[in-house]
């Protein structure tokens, strides 16, 4: 059995927990320790429930509070050599990251807490952006947020997953008719920004397989999406792909508040 919880998912901040009931990891550090402590305590948990932090990329909504994490709770921070180099220069992390720095190898697998971890690169306009495949005997979870477009490698690794957390950031009609300037719209939708609902739905058709038990849609835009639009697009894709066979559970993750604590079983 795996346990999954989103503490915040969107441009306001990103932080997720994945564990097995005995140990776990955080993915990203975009919320304050005060909020994290509160949300953990509401589930009867504390900082001892995770032994490491994984970082997906160096945008501020994913690392805003990583410096205080390093200073105050001193958990090892795992990410790629490219991202650790960027964090060593970033004004929010440079004074604290050295004591917690652990490099993931350029190729192959790493043991991080209870998980065997594989990272993979995804297109996004950060220094580098990665997704993670986390494997234990209790199941395999793939996390990919802030994805400009879906790559063949990401699809292949997601097809091995029992549980999938993936971006469904914006509705194209809302984006194009909304208040954003042209340059920002293009940054979002031209392949190195974010994944639209339709792109997420198309990816799910390629990814879904009989062993996929749950899909969580993350990083929904506040201004250019709604949970219903994201859910409906991906639900229809799963209906079409599964053709009456059993479908994975589908959920959208809230932007600024924690999700429920999900128990994940293969």
Regions from the PLM with identified roles:
Residues 152-252:
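Cap/insert and terminal regions of metallo-dependent hydrolase folds
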């Amino acid at each position: 059995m795996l346990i999954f919880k989103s503490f915040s998912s969107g441009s306001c901040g990103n932080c997720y927990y994945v564990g097995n009931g005995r140990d776990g990891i955080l993915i990203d550090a975009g919320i304050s320790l005060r909020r994290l402590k509160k949300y953990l305590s509401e589930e009867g948990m504390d900082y001892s429930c995770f032994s490491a932090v994984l970082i997906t990329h160096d945008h501020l909504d994913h690392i805003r509070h990583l410096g205080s994490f390093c200073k105050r709770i001193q958990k090892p921070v795992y990410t790629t050599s490219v991202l650790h180099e960027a964090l060593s220069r970033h004004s929010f992390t440079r004074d604290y990251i050295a004591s917690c720095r652990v490099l993931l190898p350029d190729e192959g697998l790493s043991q991080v807490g209870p998980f065997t971890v594989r990272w993979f690169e995804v297109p996004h306009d950060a220094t580098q952006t990665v997704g993670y495949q986390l494997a234990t005997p209790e199941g395999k979870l793939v996390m990919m947020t802030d994805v400009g477009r879906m790559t063949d490698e990401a699809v292949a690794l997601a097809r091995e997953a029992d549980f999938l957390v993936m971006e469904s950031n914006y509705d194209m009609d809302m984006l194009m008719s909304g208040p954003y300037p042209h340059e920002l719209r293009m940054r979002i939708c031209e392949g190195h920004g974010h994944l639209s609902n339709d792109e997420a739905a198309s990816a799910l058709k390629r990814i879904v397989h009989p062993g996929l038990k749950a899909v969580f849609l993350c990083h929904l835009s506040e201004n250019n999406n709604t949970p219903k639009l994201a859910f409906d697009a991906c639900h229809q894709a799963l209906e079409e792909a599964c053709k009456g066979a059993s479908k994975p559970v589908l959920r959208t993750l809230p932007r600024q508040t924690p999700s429920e604590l999900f128990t994940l079983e293969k």
